[in-house]
Structures are given as structure tokens and as C-alpha cells.
Design a protein with these regions (language model features):
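Core beta-strand elements of the Rossmann-like FAD/NAD(P) dinucleotide-binding domain
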Residues: 2-4, 191-201
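Flavin (primarily FAD) binding-site architecture
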Residues: 204-219
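Flavin (FAD/FMN) cofactor-binding and adjacent substrate-gating region
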Residues: 90-167, 174-180, 302, 321-329, ...
Length: 405
């Protein structure tokens, strides 16, 4: 039976990030994904690398600071799939006073190590604005767009580039400790072929299924509860020709993004709905469609109806249960749990997390795993470039060269 240093179960952004980091430190790594890479939560995001402006209202300063710093790192790691984007925030005084927004944006500008992105500014909307006439003022700040699925794929490519192995459509069916090692069994979901490996360490990065794998795959108690929060988006024909995205405030204190996508479309989302079903079966509800249309139509001159929707998508955020009353108040921060058996066979489990902070999450995961591996290499991903990201010149020059081809 083949022995690996580390087996990572889960081919979303957290699993791929941990596997890539571990492989780059010299460990023999195997990553198992039951379906396809980024097939669940990681490809159903708002496709943003952002600090999370709204998290400041929940006093999540550590998370915002880390996310803002990582935003700068990821722009350098993945310039081919991550791009700066300006966000316009229409001011609606009865929801949040201007002074509160200014303080929030000041903190947003300064909490992270912002070096490449312009800071926030105030705006006045004139007669040619795409917004309704009563919306006359607003704010603009910087965040970034990313191709979420390709970010996962690039990390999986890095696993292979660093000597690791990635198996998709291979479901881990069980994992147990035996003689100081993990015995991991898996099955090819297409052919039924069975596999088994030994591993010195195991990572449970199965996202919405993290607790289920504890219960059914390892028959161990999960150290934390998970709350599944559904986020849905609608995709419509491009609602304006501007390059900027919009971040809309709603009466329930939530925010909704309107994001340019693929030149011809706009993504509108997201929602926050408690979800109890199978994560694979998640889909948008009519109430969510009505909610997103209402928030959009409250702000924009160009009105949308159900008939304008060309596509919808939904994902499930696996958030660590902090007993918050409402879905939007649950922390988006991550928790890493590690335990072993007599100093061997560590199990590291990932609860929560964000697309933006995946690299730092992976680095923290390897910090926890390092004591179990003699001779493991140092942290390295902060200065790395993901496969495909080694472009010559700046991003605009690179894009122009591609267009000329």
C-alpha cells in the first residue's frame, strides 16, 4: 500500500490551497475530490477578492485586515485571473449616515497593506447616472474580481507542478487510524474502482460536507458545528456599460453586488438563507429571485423583471456555527482544528473560510502540521506565482497583446 505524507480530502479552494502549499514544502501529497474541482461552493461565489467591507459592522477587524492584505498578494500571484475593480456605493441616508460610511471606508483603506489599488473617494451622481434621480451621492472604493473556478484549478496545477497528485471523481469513503498512520479508502465514482493509501497526516477540507465526513467517513465526533448558508445569484444582460461594480444597501442592512461579468452580463447577488438540505441539490428559490430584483430595482433606472434572467446559480457556505441569530451575522472567519493520536497521524479539519483568504488559511494549516514532519520546508506561497500568471509587462499590455493575436 502506497504511503503519502499528507492526503487532502476536498478539491475546493481550501483543499487545493493546502495541498499546493504542502507539496511546495517537500511533502508527498495526494488530493482527492469526489466530483470535479471547484464543483460546489468554490465556483458559486460572487467572484470577488475583497476585504469584506460589511464585516466591519460586525467588528471582524482581524478577518478584514487579513483579507485586505491577501487581496494584494493574490493580485500578484494570479494577474491572469484576478483584476482590480472599483465599487460604487450609492448613499441612502436612512440606512447608514455618511459619516459612518466614511469611517468604514477609511478603515478599509488602512487596515490592509494597500500598495497597488487606489483609495476610496466620494461621488456625486448627475443626470447621466444609471441610478435613480433621488440617489445623488455615493462613494467609490477598490476591491478585485477573480475567476473563482480557475483559481482552484491553478492551485491544483501547482500541486502537480510541485510533485503532488490530484485525483478527481474519486470519493473518499473512509479514513481510520491504524499503527500511527491513516488508512484512507476511496472509490472512482465512474468505474467503481477501489483505492487505498496510507498517510502520515490527513486534511478534511470537504467544505459543506466537513461534518458529514466526520460522522460517516471517520466515525469521529466533529469538534465544531456547521451552519450551511445558501448564497444565490442571478445573471442578467449587462445593465450598464460602466466598468465599475455597484454595492447596494438594502432595508434589511444587507448588501447586494451588481458586478460586470464577461462583457455581456451582470451578476446580481448574493442572498443569505439558512440551508438544511443536500449541498449538491442547492438551487435558488423564487423568494431569493424576488429579493435580488427588488434590491436592484430600488436603485437603478433600468428596471429588471423575472424574464430578464438568463441564468441563476447557488452555493452553500459552510460556516462555523457561532450561534449568531441571523445568517448574515455568522462569522466568515475560518477555524482550523487539529488533533492526533499519541503524537502521530494528525487530522486537520477546516471549518469556514473565504475565497480571498484561502492562501493564508493554507499557510496557517501548514503551521499546525509542521511539527509532525521533520525536515518540512518553510512557507513559500506569498512570493509565488500561480500557473499561467507569469505574464510579461503590466496587465493592460498583456491584455492588448492577447487581443492582437
Amino acid at each position: 500500500m502506497e504511503t503519502k505524507d499528507l492526503i487532502v480530502i476536498g478539491g475546493g479552494i481550501n483543499g487545493a490551497g493546502i495541498a499546493a502549499d504542502a507539496a511546495g514544502r517537500g511533502l508527498s501529497v495526494l488530493m482527492l475530490e469526489a466530483q470535479d474541482l471547484a464543483c460546489a461552493t468554490s465556483s458559486a461565489s460572487s467572484k470577488l477578492i475583497h476585504g469584506g467591507l460589511r464585516y466591519l459592522e460586525h467588528y471582524e477587524f482581524r478577518l478584514v485586515s487579513e483579507a485586505l492584505a491577501e487581496r494584494e498578494v493574490l493580485l500578484k500571484m494570479a494577474p491572469h485571473i484576478a483584476f482590480p475593480m472599483r465599487f460604487r456605493l450609492p448613499h441612502r441616508p436612512h440606512l447608514r449616515p455618511a459619516w459612518m460610511i466614511r469611517i468604514g471606508l477609511f478603515m478599509y483603506d488602512h487596515l490592509g497593506k494597500r500598495t497597488s489599488l487606489p483609495g476610496s473617494t466620494g461621488l456625486r451622481f448627475g443626470a447621466n447616472s444609471v441610478l435613480k434621480p433621488e440617489i445623488k451621492r455615493g462613494f467609490e472604493y477598490s476591491d478585485c474580481w477573480v475567476d473563482d473556478a480557475r483559481l482552484v484549478l491553478a492551485n491544483a496545477q501547482m500541486v502537480v507542478r510541485k510533485g503532488g497528485e490530484v485525483l478527481t471523481r474519486t470519493r473518499a469513503t473512509s479514513a481510520r487510524r491504524e499503527n500511527g498512520l491513516w488508512i484512507v479508502e476511496a472509490e472512482d465514482i465512474d468505474t467503481g474502482k477501489k483505492y487505498s493509501w496510507q498517510a502520515r497526516g490527513l486534511v478534511n477540507a470537504t467544505g459543506p460536507w466537513v461534518k458529514q465526513f466526520f460522522d460517516e467517513g471517520m466515525h469521529l465526533p466533529s469538534p465544531y458545528g456547521i451552519r450551511l448558508i445558501k448564497g444565490s445569484h442571478i445573471v442578467v444582460p449587462r445593465v450598464h456599460t460602466q466598468k465599475q461594480a455597484y454595492i447596494l444597501q438594502n432595508e434589511d442592512k444587507r448588501i447586494v453586488f451588481v458586478i460586470p461579468w464577461m462583457d455581456e452580463f451582470s451578476i446580481i447577488g448574493t442572498t443569505d438563507v439558512e440551508y438544511k438540505g443536500d449541498p449538491k441539490a442547492v438551487k435558488i428559490e423564487e423568494s431569493e429571485i424576488n429579493y435580488l430584483l427588488k434590491v436592484y430595482n430600488t436603485h437603478f433606472k433600468k428596471q429588471l423583471s423575472r424574464d430578464d434572467i438568463v441564468w441563476t446559480y447557488s452555493g452553500v457556505r459552510p460556516l462555523c456555527d457561532d450561534e449568531s441569530d441571523s445568517p448574515q451575522a455568522i462569522t466568515r472567519d475560518y477555524t482550523l482544528d487539529i488533533h492526533d493520536e499519541n503524537g502521530k497521524a494528525p487530522l486537520l479539519s477546516v471549518f469556514g473560510g473565504k475565497l480571498t483568504t484561502y492562501r493564508k488559511l493554507a499557510e496557517h494549516a501548514l503551521e499546525k502540521l509542521t511539527p509532525y514532519y521533520q525536515g518540512i520546508g518553510p512557507a513559500w506561497t506569498k512570493e509565488s506565482v500561480l500557473p499561467g500568471g507569469a505574464i510579461e509587462g503590466d496587465r493592460d499590455d498583456y491584455a492588448a497583446r492577447l487581443r492582437r493575436r
